[in-house]
Amino acid sequence: MAKVLIKKLASSVQLPTYKTSGASGMDLMAFISETIILKPQSSCLVPTGISVAFSEEFEIQIRPRSGLAAKNNVSVLNTPGTIDSDYRGEIKVILFNHGNNEFIINNNDRIAQMILTPVVKMELEETETLPETIRGEGGFGSTGK
């Protein structure tokens, strides 16, 4: 288990939690003073009231909650959102309402989940040619349905 330091930005903030022993993500809660009405086909930035610190071997990914997506057509817009190891500001979640009905966000509503994920850094090596593959340059549906 990797250690993540967490700072409450107000005493009444609810800390993220794993809801089951098998959960890979901790639920993030909205920390808002007034209800947010998320209109259809619109986005909003929802504060969580927390900031974190962790090893640079990791990132935290912010992902949608499947229940919000399936039942309310609401998801995290920049999925997955990335919290870099050197970011110390408040975690905020960009929610998007894909549906046709308004979506109400109240304080302490579970709005997303965060997952600690290992990061493997790339070493780029410039080249004039790349190795051939069967697929080649085919993309965007080139392998069939």
Where are the language model's segments positioned?
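DUTPase catalytic domain/fold
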Residues: M1-K145
